């Protein structure tokens, strides 16, 4: 059985303004004095400009922006769609100019989108979930913010209550895994930080993270109800997603470490994973189509030959699909395993 979570779902989104009313020039004059004239239109003094590394964080920011009253907000995402691996994205000069001039920059951190935040002079305007480390592919060491000399918007190990169900856990880095947006708590914390920043700038805006919390806490509750299954991953895309479920990851450690480091697993590590798939102990393969190689194709073929269910979980949603809708599809695909 194959659960495809990559089908398109069209709706208008990102790079649009939440234009409820214009603020005074002084209230939102956050554009740097060194901004170039060519980008003045994109950074109007009465507009709060938010730049996100990917559409995931752009959708989180947009959901908060949609809750505001009396403030003009523009959200721009630099990476959209699922036709590329965001690990290797190279921003254009225009992308970086927009980020430098933005009032707020939203990233995941942990090295994943270091191509954006490592080049910014003003690190204090960055909202992030994992520490702002460089992407040196060394995931064996503990991450920290020392390279940047500050503790801007740190969310790691910040507890969040998930409501009546009592599902409360902390945002913690799992083996240096960068896919933090699949941690419901991390998403809610970033939304909270965005709302706080908007309200600091424009108190009358009444920005709220309520919509994000409502959507994501519901998904989190559904994840907690997943049944016991054994799985392996073509790449550790679902670590945060499944961390608080009864599902067990049987991916061999050598293969896992190599894929976390964005390296090629050794032949012995690949053989160990293939053997695991053939052992009869694996119920599902979690497959990341955006990091597909000849090796991962072989892994998928083996799983399908063994009658193992395949659930696709990508780095980013397809173009024109909202992250929350994509997240819902991913959870639905996992729930279908229990049907």
Q: Which residue stretches match the model-derived regions?
A:
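Extracytoplasmic metal-acquisition and chelation regions
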Residues: 2-24, 30-339
């Amino acid at each position: 059985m194959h659960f495809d979570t990559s089908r398109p779902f069209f709706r208008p989104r990102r790079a649009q303004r939440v234009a409820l009313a214009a603020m005074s020039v002084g209230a939102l004059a956050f554009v740097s004095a060194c901004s170039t004239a060519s980008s003045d239109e994109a950074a109007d003094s009465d507009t709060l400009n938010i730049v996100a590394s990917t559409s995931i964080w752009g959708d989180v920011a947009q959901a908060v922006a949609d809750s505001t009253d009396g403030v003009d907000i523009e959200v721009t995402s630099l990476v959209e769609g699922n036709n590329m691996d965001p690990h290797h994205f190279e921003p254009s000069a225009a992308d970086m100019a927009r980020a430098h001039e933005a009032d707020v920059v939203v990233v995941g951190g942990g090295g994943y989108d270091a191509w954006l935040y490592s080049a910014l002079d003003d690190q204090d305007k960055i909202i992030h979930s994992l520490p702002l480390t460089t992407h040196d592919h060394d995931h064996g060491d503990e991450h920290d913010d020392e390279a940047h000399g500050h503790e801007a918007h740190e969310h790691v190990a910040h507890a969040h209550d998930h409501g009546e169900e009592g599902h409360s856990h902390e945002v913690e880095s799992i083996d240096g895994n960068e896919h933090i947006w699949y941690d419901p708590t991390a998403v809610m914390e970033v939304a909270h930080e965005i709302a706080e920043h908007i309200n600091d700038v424009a108190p009358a805006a009444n920005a709220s993270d309520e919509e994000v919390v409502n959507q994501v806490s519901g998904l989190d509750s559904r994840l907690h109800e997943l049944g016991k299954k054994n799985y392996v991953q073509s790449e550790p895309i679902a670590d945060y997603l499944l961390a608080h479920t009864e599902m067990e990851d049987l991916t061999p450690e050598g293969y896992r470490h190599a894929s976390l480091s964005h390296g090629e697993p050794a032949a012995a590590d690949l053989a160990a994973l293939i053997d695991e798939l053939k052992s009869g102990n694996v119920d599902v393969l979690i497959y990341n189509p955006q990091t597909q190689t000849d090796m991962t194709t072989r892994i998928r073929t083996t799983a399908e030959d063994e009658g193992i269910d395949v659930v696709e979980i990508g780095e980013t949603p397809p173009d024109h699909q909202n992250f929350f809708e994509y997240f819902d599809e991913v959870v639905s695909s996992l729930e279908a395993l229990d049907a």
